[in-house]
């Protein structure tokens, strides 16, 4: 089994909590008062452990993730003079796109619509590259569609169409169907 699933298994009453889980709980406990922590169920504690792990994983990947709400209070206390002055990564941070926990799965590039051609110019401009490889040659001839245009031509069904409509094809040969009678009907 996966080691991260250790939190999902609930320890039996009187059993010792494994050291790994206890350490994770201790990391989270510092964000809550003692009364809040003792009132919390084990499932809530596990939820906060996973939330903190997600936040740390996203920041390691370079995303500027929103700080989980339970961590905001502690971060505000740190800002008043504790750890932020001694943080070695503080000056080395690079501006990255801001992500929230739920949006990580739905990452997709935004496609901007093409601007309409000006009235006086009917032909589309083709980008040119200069350099030793191309020497001013056109990247794509004006008559042929680009790869992105081909993709957009073959894209899936439009809104309102049935999902399988674009996959249906006509038969090349005519098929003749015969009606088959049931043997029970013939007996009567």
Curated annotation (Swiss-Prot):
Site (Breakpoint for translocation to form the SSXT-SSX2 fusion protein (rare)): 68-69
UniProt-annotated stretches for the region Disordered: 76-188
Site entry: Breakpoint for translocation to form the SSXT-SSX2 fusion protein: 110-111
Listed GO biological process terms: regulation of DNA-templated transcription
Cellular component annotations (GO), alphabetically ordered: nucleus
Tissues of expression: Expressed at high level in the testis. Expressed at low level in thyroid. Not detected in tonsil, colon, lung, spleen, prostate, kidney, striated and smooth muscles. Detected in rhabdomyosarcoma and fibrosarcoma cell lines. Not detected in mesenchymal and epithelial cell lines.
Similarity annotation: Belongs to the SSX family.
Name the UniProt record assigns to this protein: Protein SSX2
Species this protein is from: Homo sapiens
């Amino acid at each position: 089994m996966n080691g991260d699933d250790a939190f999902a298994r609930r320890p039996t009453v009187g059993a010792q909590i494994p050291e790994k889980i206890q350490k994770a709980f201790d990391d989270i406990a510092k964000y809550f008062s003692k009364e809040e922590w003792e009132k919390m169920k084990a499932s809530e504690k596990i939820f906060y452990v996973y939330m903190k792990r997600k936040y740390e994983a996203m920041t390691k990947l370079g995303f500027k993730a929103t700080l989980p709400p339970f961590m905001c209070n502690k971060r505000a206390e740190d800002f008043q003079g504790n750890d932020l002055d001694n943080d070695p990564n503080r000056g080395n941070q690079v501006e990255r796109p801001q992500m929230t926990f739920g949006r990580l799965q739905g990452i997709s590039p935004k496609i901007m619509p093409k601007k309409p051609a000006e009235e006086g110019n009917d032909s589309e401009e083709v980008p040119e590259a200069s350099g030793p490889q191309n020497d001013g040659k056109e990247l794509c001839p004006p008559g042929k569609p680009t790869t992105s245009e081909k993709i957009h031509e073959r894209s899936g069904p439009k809104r309102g169409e049935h999902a399988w409509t674009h996959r249906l094809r006509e038969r090349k040969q005519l098929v003749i169907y015969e009606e088959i009678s049931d043997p029970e009907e013939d007996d009567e």
